[in-house]
Amino acid sequence: MTHQKVENNLQHQPQISKYEKFEIIYKKLKHIFIGFFTILTCTLIILLVITVFYFQSITKESEHISDNTLRLKLLNIPGTQDINYSNQHILSEYNQSLNPLIVGPKNVNKNIIKALTASEDSLFYRHNGILPKALLRAVGQDLFNTDAATGGSTITQQLVKNQVLTNEKTYDRKANELVLSMRAETLLTKDEIIYTYLNIVPFGRDYNGANISGISSASYSLFGKPPSEINIAESAYLIGLLQSPYYYTPYQEDGVLKPDDQIQIGINRQHYVLKRMLVEKKITQHEFNQSEKFDIKKHLMTK
């Protein structure tokens, strides 16, 4: 009798439908997801706050540099006597300089600028001094200790590194480089940045074995003519040297030309620059084909 009552009670209990079961599971999963998302969000906020404070602590060096001091440091070209760096029209100073190794827009063939921006910083005229994506890629390769070239530094960053900071590979130096690069973009025009960079950057060695810096010195030393007369092939070759000047230079320490197989390394780099110029539509297919046929070794200066 008792057993029969229990069965009757069970039969009269409301049955849970599939929909109700699904709703119960859904609510539980929803609470778990909200809890997980809340914890994740709080963790990210904490990490962001820590990162901001850490970044501020390691960029104090850049905060102590005034705008005027930073501008003068960025523009300073060692060994120049006739440049008035306080002149707000610094490109005019470069154009009118009595020193043939200091050049401005009127003294530099536009192919050099095209080669430089196409191969080293294709977004130069659009960014504000840094490229977040390239920077993250560089950091990732640094963390995983890979040797592949990242292209993480813009021309502005390279100017800051050469003129204001050192070449040491520390996170402090890199952080200050980022801050100063963004400030540099507010103090100088794009043309002031790129022509100053071309006037100070190292290009390896000349045919006497001496170290050379600046596009004018490189143009005279390698091809025996001013940068205003450099053709597309020569422009690509000179700019190709910038990634690793003493590796790609065609000259040995005594100024003698390297063996053909070593000179070819620099020519291969030149072909890369030409391809980048074609991809970025800085040159036509015909100009690319003609430049690839140009005999660089035949035109190099020798003793």
Where are these regions (language model features)?
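Juxtamembrane regions of bacterial inner-membrane/periplasmic proteins
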Residues: 2-303
